[in-house]
Amino acid sequence: MSEVKTQIKPKAIFLMGPTASGKTALAIALRQKLPVDLISVDSALIYRGMDIGTAKPDETEQSLAPHRLIDILDPALPYSAADFRKDALKAMEEITAAGRIPLLVGGTMLYFKALLEGLSPLPSANPEIRAEIEKKAAEQGWEAIHQELASVDPVAAKRIHPNDPQRLSRALEVYLISGKSMTELTQISGEALPYDVYQFAIAPKDRNVLHQRIEARFKQMLTCGFEDEVKSLYQRGDLHEDLPSIRCVGYRQMWSYLSGEIDYDEMVYRGICATRQLAKRQITWLRGWHDVHWLDSEDFEQSLNTVLQVVSA
């Protein structure tokens, strides 16, 4: 009688949460307690020269707990969820091969989802079709594009705001390339993550606490030279406000200030508001997440102990 061997999956840890929730501090503490190596899951931290406005781990934090997938790309270059999944899987394999546990920490929920569930078979971007859409938008307005999308993909049109040209263009582009709606294609599952994943979400129980942290951190960034950081990017000449890097919260608002569209006080106000809106979207994602252990960022020791207990069980 032959024995059926069950393959034991390697462990991985997800530490997710909204911006300014204390993820980095907890990840560094876990690095001192567990055989983990960190992988950043953040669509802003990938860019070089964008340190202050992204709250990128500083030299001290990086020396305590080196993060992979930080500073891997110039701000002029694109980076997709598919790129992240490929890079993250490679990093996870290397960490696991060294006998350690990958600890993935960040707030870009789309990246976590792509890694956990795999990617739907969406077609690659087509510059010609994208140009046609943008030409039509220039002539008729993005509202017309939104109406066209609603006729072929009402679910996506309901989700995407008429003033969001990037997502509108992509959703319509997918249909024009494939003949199928983005909604239909995203229901097709990709390759699941071959790891035993322990998932944690950290956030304050009181949203007002998070709002206060966000405001304090944004003002601290300004004190630390955020304006000069964005000015260096602005003066390069090859970057513009439609790039994903410059659309990052804080950077977009500072860019508008440097270009003379808004004054300084308005930049601060919009930057704080945009960061709060980002945090709200991140929390909304997490509330719909399955199999996640919630941690209170106001009780650091309890959060640390909870992770240690769950992972060691």
Curated annotation (Swiss-Prot):
Membrane-spanning ranges: none
GO function terms (MF aspect): ATP binding; tRNA dimethylallyltransferase activity
Functional note: Catalyzes the transfer of a dimethylallyl group onto the adenine at position 37 in tRNAs that read codons beginning with uridine, leading to the formation of N6-(dimethylallyl)adenosine (i(6)A).
Listed EC numbers: 2.5.1.75
Residue span of region Interaction with substrate tRNA: 42-45, 166-170, 247-252, 280-287
The species this protein was found in: Proteus mirabilis (strain HI4320)
Keyword Nucleotide-binding: yes
The protein, known as: tRNA dimethylallyltransferase
Reactions mediated catalytically: adenosine(37) in tRNA + dimethylallyl diphosphate = N(6)-dimethylallyladenosine(37) in tRNA + diphosphate
Family annotation (InterPro entries): Dimethylallyltransferase, IPT, P-loop_NTPase
GO biological process entries: tRNA modification
Site (Interaction with substrate tRNA): 108, 130
Residues holding ATP: 17-24
Cofactors: Mg(2+)
Keyword ATP-binding: yes
